[in-house]
Amino acid sequence: MAFDSLSEKLQNIFKNLRGKGRLSEADVKAALKEVKLALLEADVNFKVVKQFIKSVEERAIGQDVMSSLTPGQMVIKIVNEEMVSLMGSETTEIALKPGSEITVIMMAGLQGAGKTTTTAKLAGKFKAKGRKPLLVACDVYRPAAIEQLTINGNKQGVEVFSMGTNQKPVDIAKAAIAHAKNNDFNTVILDTAGRLHVDEDMMNELIEIKANVSVDQTILVVDSMTGQDAVNVASSFNEKVGIDGVILTKLDGDTRGGAALSIKAVTGKPILYVGMGEKLSDLEQFYPDRMASRILGMGDVLTLIEKAEAQIDADKAKEMEAKIKKAEFDFDDFLEYTGQIRNMGGIGSIMSMLPGMGLGGNMKNIQMPDEDEAEANLKRTEAIIHSCLLYTSDA
């Protein structure tokens, strides 16, 4: 996951702080100098880092901290609180109109950011909440994008409105909203065209759609792997088109993660969701406090619980528990169990949410298998079980 390198560096810095019985002003300043370097290496915006360190230092170098019985923990607590504040303090929901009123959401972003896939993921989120979403293919320049949206929409059980590549995006948007009104859809999501870079034609097209269609929310999808470029892209879109929030994709990859720590501070716009994988279910609501906790190696147990609740049926869990107690746990139960683990993101994803088990924590001392190898072994085991003949005592 992104932040693994940053997390490891920060935890090593704080480990040294915790080892000191008392802290001097020089100790705090030396530690914060290392924190500053770690944040810059993670590609966090320089101005953001400078203000962050200043805020932490003002709070950390004080009588309450220095005279505390656990000054190291107090400094870590301050860093955690300032990091949460940096990323937005509280979770921001996408504002949706109540009942049958139609909410129009325009998705924007550069090519390769994962905008079309994210659009389908978002539609699935809304459907799960009881909304009736309509996906609209407004990318008339890339036929593959229309096909991709249609395929993913079908997988999510969401209707996709398309008029091919010979219509203007603004006309498609208008027709889609009329279709939504006539067919009781209450959430219209416009998948607009991406470009290889920010250009005037792209911006003007988005501005035209906003001017002619009552867009309620404009959401920008940015690739977290592009680091500071993601922040620059967000700033450009916000200045020229106006955005209401950001979705960060590919945060599960080997990225430095600086964009997540910079976007809110630079643009003033919240991060709404983060993409944590390629599956259509791999879209997580962004919680600043939970993300800060992950970065500092404190885990994210709440998200783990939510994933478990979403994937594991309570009655089946009790039934499985009873089987284990009676020594009746069989291969069918094992297959069901492994399926639930996979749906939660796999063993690596689960372990990363446990306190101290990120790469910067205790996990580095544990021999963990390669995720691809572990997945292959799991599939092999499942295939062996599926190939077994059912044995009965009457055979």
Give the residues covered by each predicted segment.
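Conserved ATPase-coupling elements of RecA-like P-loop NTPase cores
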Residues: 145-146, 197-203, 230-231
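Small-residue-rich helix-loop
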Residues: 357-379
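Inter-motif core of Ras-like GTPase G domains
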Residues: 204-223
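Conserved phosphate-handling catalytic cores of large alpha/beta enzymes
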Residues: 197, 217-329
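C-terminal accessory/binding modules appended to enzymatic or scaffolding proteins
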Residues: 377-390
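Conserved small/polar residues in nucleotide/adenosyl-binding loops
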Residues: 391-395
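Primarily NTPase-proximal linker/entry elements flanking Walker-type ATP/GTP-binding cores
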Residues: 6-138, 145-165, 172-182, 186-192
